[in-house]
Each structure stands twice: as structure tokens, then as C-alpha cells.
A protein has these predicted regions:
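An acidic, low-aromatic, low-complexity terminal/linker signal
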Residues: 1-154
Length: 154
């Protein structure tokens, strides 16, 4: 059996969603902010709870806890604002977290073929094996129009 190769040590941010901890690569973190007003409006993207205004940007709030733990967060302590690359552009997404966040340096083990698409890698910290998240697989992006769906034209 082939052993997965170890990557170099990388900085990651540990975040708590309910009872579980997950990680994001530190280079994807823009900032950690206190909960603020979430603006809700009619839309067709169930993964988006609403938006927050941050540094002159409209940032979608995506509660990924339900996908990862099976439960929506009932308590939001912070929003972890992260960056992601979509279609050549960098945009922000706010992830509600229920506990403290911690910056660590850890050796990452690449995700295997049998791992879920939301797992970018694995790390070990304080005796716990933690999933390093792939935001592109967890958060909604621009989707092509469905056949039969109306499209807006200028």
C-alpha cells in the first residue's frame, strides 16, 4: 500500500463549527469579523444565508456547517471572511463560525481519491485529525443557466 506523501508545513486557520474543528489554508483568509447585520433578500441560492457589508464589498454569507456536520449553526461567534478563485476572479465569502479561530503551522497530507470533494488535505493537531477545506467545493459559484430557465438579456 502506497503511503500518501507529506506536504511542507503550511499555515492554517482552525475554525469551529458546532462540536467539530476544520481548517482553511491561511492564505485564503481575509479577516475574522464580529457578527454583523446579515441582509436577506429573495434569491435562488439556498447555500447563501444573505450578505454582509465589509470594506465596501457585498460578501455572501454561506453556512457550510450543515454540509459538514449535518446541523445548521444556531450560534455565530464570528464570520471568517475567506477568499476563493472563481473564473479567474478572486471573491470573498463569509463563513459563520461558532467558536474561537486559531492560526497554526502543520504538515498537510493531501486528500485521497476516496475523500469527499470538500477535503483539500488533512492535518493533525493536538491528537486530532482535521479536514482542510476546499472552499470551491463547499460554497456556491456561478452556475450555467438551466435549460428552460429564463435568462436576463440587456
Amino acid at each position: 500500500m502506497k503511503q500518501p506523501e507529506q506536504l511542507d508545513a503550511r499555515s492554517c486557520v482552525l475554525l469551529r463549527l458546532g462540536e467539530r474543528r476544520f481548517a482553511l489554508a491561511a492564505e485564503h483568509i481575509a479577516e475574522l469579523v464580529a457578527p454583523s447585520r446579515v441582509y436577506r433578500f429573495a434569491h435562488r441560492t439556498p447555500e447563501i444565508d444573505g450578505v454582509i457589508l465589509r470594506r465596501g464589498r457585498v460578501v455572501p454569507v454561506c453556512d457550510v456547517a450543515e454540509k459538514l456536520t449535518g446541523k445548521k449553526l444556531t450560534y455565530r461567534r464570528f464570520y471568517l471572511v475567506a477568499t476563493r478563485r472563481r473564473e479567474g476572479n478572486t471573491d470573498w465569502v463569509a463563513l459563520p463560525v461558532s467558536g474561537e479561530c486559531e492560526l497554526i503551522t502543520a504538515d498537510l497530507t493531501p486528500a485521497g481519491e476516496s475523500d469527499s470533494p470538500h477535503v483539500a488535505a488533512w492535518l493533525s493537531h493536538d491528537g486530532e485529525v482535521i479536514e482542510v477545506l476546499n472552499l470551491d467545493a463547499l460554497t456556491p459559484g456561478a452556475k450555467l443557466a438551466q435549460p428552460g430557465m429564463p435568462e436576463a438579456h440587456a
